Design a protein with these regions (language model features):
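Intracellular loop-helix junctions on the cytosolic face of multi-pass helical membrane proteins
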Residues: 1-8, 100-105, 118-119, 133-326, ...
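Helix-loop boundary and gating motifs at the non-cytosolic
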Residues: 2-56, 256-261, 313-317, 321-345
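Loop-to-transmembrane helix entry/capping segments in MFS-fold secondary transporters
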Residues: 43-44, 133-143, 430, 513-525
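Helix-to-loop junctions at the C-terminal end of transmembrane segments
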Residues: 59-75, 446-459, 544
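C-terminal ends and interior cores of transmembrane alpha-helices
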Residues: 82-101, 469-482
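Hydrophobic core of transmembrane alpha-helices in multi-pass small-molecule transporters
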Residues: 92-96, 100-119, 486-500
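Intracellular juxtamembrane helix-capping segments at the cytosolic ends
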Residues: 118-131, 500-514
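C-terminal transmembrane helical hairpin of 12-TM major facilitator-type secondary transporters
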Residues: 443, 455, 461-503
Length: 586
């Protein structure tokens, strides 16, 4: 019994919930840092507060995948989790902008991320459950379309609220503007309604039907079992975990000590403590398996060790693909403003700031010394560049804001004008980066339906490699751009890569997974999205500050290079379920 093909509108309905999910992500990405700063967070604290997203994804998605694989009730298999996640996420979107304290906003971010992950993970598995192999590329491309549309509109919601509906975008100190609040209310409603549309307009196959479809597929195409059968006993597999886990704990402890002893950037603790934490969980799984406890933790890590070959190959591709994305998201604003816009100061202006800084008395504010210490490090770096023969340097907004806000500093009018010019250039550049991000999301939505056509003419691997290469060219080309308008052209390549990353790897993966493990493996696959994010948050600041001498543009070039590497690695992936591949074999 072959899995039936679904009409276009049925695929539309089953993917429509992603519109709401991405509205939640778009509002979060565009406004949460603003909420944190409004409630008193120092800029240096924000990356740590943002670690909620990858950590919750790392924990929640495999658990939800495992639970949904083993759920069947009158609502179905995946849809109960759509409903629970939608309710929780919608409530979190309403509460977050009304948080009176920073700790409450940070807590709501964790709840929001967990809720979004509860909803999102089963949506990936849902496509694998419902669509035959020849339609999966279209199904995941449909999700890319809704992601692009929602990201484009959601990012502009506060602007729309202010400029179209006249809702104020200013508020008393420590309060969130009404434009942001109403954007979150609207986003919460869209999230809930879009997911409910999918719940009420779709039905799911029963576990028995899915098993029959899988058996028919294996018989028709001669496919062996999609995951390796355990070739060792529980005791042997537990022993392996009991070796690997403590090794990771020890490595994490050693690296943490090195970070502490050498005074490295504190962001590196995210990586070192994370290594130890993963080791602790693996050790726990081994301990429970040794005692014949076959709960979710044991099953998740057993399945991690028994990943299908295709999934292992795709994991490496995803790792380098998402490292590039996080490099772009973190550093595009700094790269564009410092490399393309005029944020330069000459040697005389640097000397004046150094002298003014040396005359400042220590302030009593709790964060003043820390802020001034970072400004002094920047000024020392500027002096080093000038002594090396440079006639001017690129100023950081940290330095500019410090001296413009510091009322007791006596500066010449010319230097103050330079600082104001740099501030204006930075804001114009940052606004333009926001526009360019909107362009790549919008283009991703438009091009999403082109990907299945390209895959039909070539194959899924070639199409994905082309898209990643286009994205790499787009990122690297920013180094050579002098006209900001050309950034929009570069972002077309990025949009193609983004649309492909959100669809083709999942289409390839779904064909390599057994139906009864679709959810848990989609959750485990998220590891290879989250881990590069944690790695990027941990080491990119160190790399940019030391190896790249503070020039953020090279972070984009590094991202482009990792996309090229990912494009090459795609061709090593065994796409066992590619429709063209199976047609040739037949």
């Amino acid at each position: 019994m072959k899995k039936p093909r679904l009409p276009f509108w049925q695929i539309w309905n089953m993917s429509f919930g992603f519109l709401g999910i991405q509205f939640g992500f778009a509002l979060q990405n565009a406004n949460v840092s603003r909420i944190f700063e409004t409630l008193g967070a120092d800029v240096s604290q924000i990356p740590i507060l943002w670690i909620a997203a990858p950590v919750t994804g790392l924990i929640v998605q495999p658990i939800v995948g495992y639970l949904s694989d083993n759920t069947w009730n009158r609502m179905g298999r995946r849809r109960p989790y759509f409903l629970v996640g939608a309710i929780l996420a919608s409530l979190a979107l309403i509460v977050m902008p009304n948080s009176p304290y920073l700790w409450m906003a940070a807590g709501m971010l964790w709840i929001l991320d967990a809720s979004i992950n509860i909803t999102m993970e089963p949506f990936r598995a849902f496509v694998g459950d419902m669509l035959p192999s020849e339609q999966r590329t279209k199904g995941f491309a449909m999700q890319s379309f809704f992601i692009g549309i929602a990201a484009f509109v959601g990012s502009f919601l506060p602007y729309i609220m202010t400029n179209w509906f006249g809702i104020s975008n200013v508020a008393p100190e420590g309060m969130i503007p009404d434009s942001v609040k109403f954007s979150f209310y609207f986003g919460g409603a869209i999230f809930f309604l879009a997911v409910m549309w999918t719940i009420y307009r779709t039905r799911e196959y029963s576990p028995e039907q899915l098993k029959a479809f899988e058996e028919a597929e294996k018989e028709e195409h001669g496919i062996d079992e999609k995951i390796e059968a355990p070739d060792r006993s529980d005791e042997e597999r537990a022993r392996t975990k009991m070796i690997h886990g403590p090794v990771l704990i020890i490595l994490g402890a050693i690296f943490s000590y090195l970070v502490f002893n050498q005074g490295f950037a504190q962001e590196l603790y995210i990586l070192t403590v994370g290594i130890a934490g993963i080791g602790a969980i693996i050790t726990l799984a081994g301990f429970m398996q040794r005692r014949s406890m076959h709960n979710g933790v044991v099953v998740i890590f057993d399945d991690l060790y028994l990943m299908p070959k295709t999934m292992k190959q795709l994991a490496v591709v995803q790792f380098f693909s998402w490292f590039a994305l996080f490099a772009m998201w973190i550093y595009t604003t700094s790269a564009v403003t410092s490399h393309i816009y005029d944020m330069r100061m000459d040697a005389a202006e640097v000397s004046e700031l150094v002298e003014a800084g040396s005359l400042l008395e220590t302030r009593t504010e709790a964060d003043w010394f820390d802020r001034f210490g970072r400004v002094q490090r920047d000024l020392d770096n500027y002096q080093t560049q000038i002594e090396a023969g440079q006639s001017n340097v690129t100023a950081s907004m940290r330095v500019v804001n410090f001296f413009l806000e510091e009322g007791r500093v006596e500066l010449t009018e010319e230097t103050r004008q330079t600082l104001r010019r740099i501030e204006k250039e930075y804001n114009e550049g940052a606004d333009w980066v926001g526009v360019s991000f909107g362009i790549y999301n919008g283009f991703a939505a438009l091009v999403a339906f082109l990907l299945p056509v390209m895959a039909g003419f070539t194959n899924r691997k070639t199409t994905h490699a082309i898209a990643l290469t286009a994205g790499a060219i787009g990122l690297i080309s920013i180094y050579f751009i002098t006209n900001p308008m050309m950034i929009l052209v570069a972002m077309i390549g990025v949009g193609l890569a983004w649309a492909s990353i959100l669809s083709l790897p999942y289409a390839i993966l779904a064909g390599s997974l057994p139906s009864h493990k679709m959810g848990i493996y989609m959750g485990i696959f998220n590891f290879f999205i989250v881990l590069p994010q944690i790695l990027a948050a941990s080491i990119l600041g160190f790399i940019v500050g030391t190896i790249f001498d503070g020039q953020a543009i090279f972070a984009l070039i590094l991202g482009g290079c990792t996309w090229i590497l990912a494009a090459g690695l795609v061709f090593l992936v065994d796409d066992v379920d590619d429709p063209g591949h199976k047609a040739k074999e037949a």
